[in-house]
Amino acid sequence: PEGMNVQLKVVAWYVGRVGQNFDGGNPNTSAYTLFNGVNIINYDYDWDGLAYICYYSTDDPANHPDIKVHFMNGQVNGYLSPDKTNEEMHEMCVNAPNSHMDLVGSKVHSVWSSEGLAQYCKASDGTSLGYIQYMNLLDSLVAWEHDLIGLTKYNRLPDNRTMAYVNYTYYMFQGGMGVSFHVDQESRVLNCQRLMYNDFDAIWGLSHEWGHQHQMAPWLNWAG
């Protein structure tokens, strides 16, 4: 809209360091303000990133028009979503220009390594491609949390999404952006069969860390 701006954030999810005890690399975010017209972006960070347009409002989003942003150059990484086939999404992961890939479900936006998704994202039968089922599984976990804390009952469901992402520094935690698992855990947390039937710690971890993210001080806030 005239007189307004939006943020372009380029996130390098991998920055060249892998650790195990908060001694690895954290995602690096480079932010740029976009205005109407031509914007020149000089991204000079050492590692490639994925670009996100941040268009938020504190009032009713319906009061704000849609915007269009056109990138003159740069590679298209794409994102996985339930409207694509499992075969299409597998091809995207195998041929991804970036080392990481976004998955956008109805309630969860997650980011994992492209290699891990191509290798480990299997359905509950253990062999079929599992991208659609995996996104539905994550969405179900968040929907159940919304039921548990009363957001569904009192018609307070948020219109945005919660987050999950891969990290290179610690086993499992709830970071500033959402639930995070170490890259060496992708064989567990990307596999629907393991999450649903064989690995209660992994599926508990997702739900537990999202529980922290859903804490709303001072009304719902617990320690530990």
Regions from the PLM with identified roles:
Residues 1-79:
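Beta-strand-enriched, solvent-exposed domains that form extended recognition/catalytic surfaces
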Residues 30-33, 81-82, 89-91, 142-143:
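A short linear-motif detector with a strong N-terminal bias
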Residues 68-102:
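Low-complexity, Pro/Ser/Thr- and charge-rich linker/hinge segments at domain boundaries
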Residues 89-224:
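Catalytic cores of extracellular degradative/oxidative enzymes
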